[in-house]
Amino acid sequence: FILLKDVINEVGADIARFVMLTRKNDAPLDFDFDKALEQSKDNPVFYVQYAHARASSILAKAETELDLEGSKKFLLKHFNLLLQMEERSLVRLIALWPKIVESAAVKREPHRIAFYLNDLASCFHALQHKGKINPEFRFIRVGQSDLSFARLSLVRATKSIISKGLLLLGINPVHRM
């Protein structure tokens, strides 16, 4: 067996905590050091942290390229512009956040938050990847400020939820990787 302090020394407290919280409290834990240090989607803490860092980067870029004054109004006002399947999936997942937190608290099952954050990160990465392949689906669309603001509202909500979720789990969100 390995002592928890040795695990923390090897991978860091945030990684150790997240990996532990991806298991039910009555389930055995097999800690895979290689996976915990991997920088890929197979490492849930990296995947979630990377989504937060990407969202931070996208919003920082938007501040330099767009006038973000009043952009808080756009989520509801221009919701009808979010037509892509990945956008709608992200909206549905974002809407689940309050129920996830309540369920995790009532049932004393913090792994629900960790699972949800991983799902949210996956959905966000899929949407971002679609924009890399096809410029039509990028978050920031020159000449289409309404659509850009609607998409940036999704980015802002995703970043906010990941940040709050990680903090609830006692993990510090990263803004750059």
Label every PLM stretch briefly:
Residues 1-177:
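Non-catalytic interaction-recognition regions
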